[in-house]
Amino acid sequence: MMLPSRRSLLAGAAGAALTSACASTVEPPTDAAARMNAILDRRVAESLRRSPERCTSLGLTEERAGYRFIDKMSDASKQAARESRAELRAALADLRAVDRDALSARDRVTYDVVTTAWENGLATSAFDIGGGAGSPYVVTQLTGAYTNGPDFLDAQHPLRTRDEADAYLARLGEYARQLDQETAIIGEDAAASVIAPDFAIDRALVQLNAFTSRSPRDTVLVQTLVRRLPSVADLSEADRNSLIARAESAVRDAVMPAYQRQIDALRAVRPRAVHDAGVWRLPRGADMYAAALRSRTTTTLSPDEIHNMGVALIAEFNAEMDTILRAEGMTRGTVAQRVQELSRRADQLYPNTDAGREQILADLNAQTRAIEALMPQAFNTLARARLEIRRVPPYTEAGAPGGYYQRAALDGSRPGAYYINLRDTGEWPRFTLPTLNYHEGVPGHHWQISIQQESGAIPFIRSAMLGFSAFSEGWGLYAEQLADELGVYANNRLGRLGYLQSATFRASRLVVDTGMHHKRWSREQAIQSMMQATGDLESSVTTEIERYCVWPGQACSYMVGRQAINRIRDNARQRLGARFDLKAFHDTMLANGAVPLTVLEQIMTDWATAL
């Protein structure tokens, strides 16, 4: 998965566009395309100014971003979100005034993509809580500046010059300010009866306290400088020591107190927190979930339709797993019970030690090299960006998902990376690892996003700025299936079992997400449902279920997207017969960037019709 922050949810769904330069002023438009491009350029300037972190993540220059951003962090206040929403509303009104019929076919795709993104962004942010309908609680075990700020500063802030080192120190102060802004929102939302579930608050408190229990010197915020400053050529040893001392002071005097204020705020609302898992309990909860589902899936499927899709797919995948397990001589018990038994087998377990974790990373890298060699069989266009596989930082692993992807910088200065949560190697039996690799790396998120960013044929908004979970996560699941179709499991029957278990897991997500947020299931009911469907360990299932509680609808995007891609592929194959070219199908899909599923279907129908 690709892990969002509160601010990126608004920026990604409602966010920016760029067709030429990020100028603050544009020439008067002379036709429909020019009018549209002017609107998009204006909006990107607004959006990038509101997200210095996005500018850094994309590797933009100050000239392209339109301002100096390297020493700034975004405004996390509710007022800033309201101002951004007003800007977006104005941009959408202007875009709707453009004559779509006067645009070229390519520009009509951009018009449809951006319009859908902005409409969804306004719909989800209209509830004026947390990060919107898809992330209703500002601080949980997965949301809040404390979850992504340290990782951003450690992994994405550049440290190549003295100026960038000074900017890092400035960002420490900005980070403390973000924490306080989100602490204020905890109280504001609580006054509106929007409080995270008790277990989400408890997990957040564990992680916040883990940070404050360290000395400033031992936090990742200071250790980043200790580790990286020696490579800055124009710094003397005295300069390095001075910068590290200043960072320690900033953490001690600004960041740590901000953490403590956030801890105090969560403790203050904790007695009012309930154990109910779904957003149905919140004011306008049903409307909120409907908006989240529309945004996440880019469809009009109802919660009941999505729930029933999941039930049917679980039955299909379980039948295939049963066949493999019987071939392994495992015939007693349910499919889930037999998968659990296999997960505990000594030959499937890595040592729960640092050496065991290093072996997991080594095995994943070997699998990546093997699948990369097969990519010319399925694609004409190959991704160029490098991929690194990393461990989820220990300071966030308690509440982090099993894996997530971080895209490469546009300028190539930072490779793509996916993170695997290695808090307990027992959660990763050997047979489960390959399909994770294919989902997050090649031919999954890394492959799809790298080709999207490297494409010169689509506007910047569609190659780097906008995101659609149903497309990107649907592609991730389709990539798992594609790896199977390419024969990676020909001599690895248990690896294919892992793929089918993963597919079952994603189908189960449809059931439990709609179960909790629409059918009012409890957290415990959802945990039992997923364990019975997948055979996964209770610890890993619990982390997943608690994730769906705070990101309503997001888990549905995966399988809804996969099923849509398969349906579109089947339709194209049926229409074209012997003329169907899988490589061309994939190239066309990815070259057009992440798009809503409705737009994807039209793009691929037009492609097939034109052949």
Model-derived regions, located:
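N-terminal maturation segment of proteins
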Residues: 23-611
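N-terminal export signals
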Residues: 2-3, 8-25
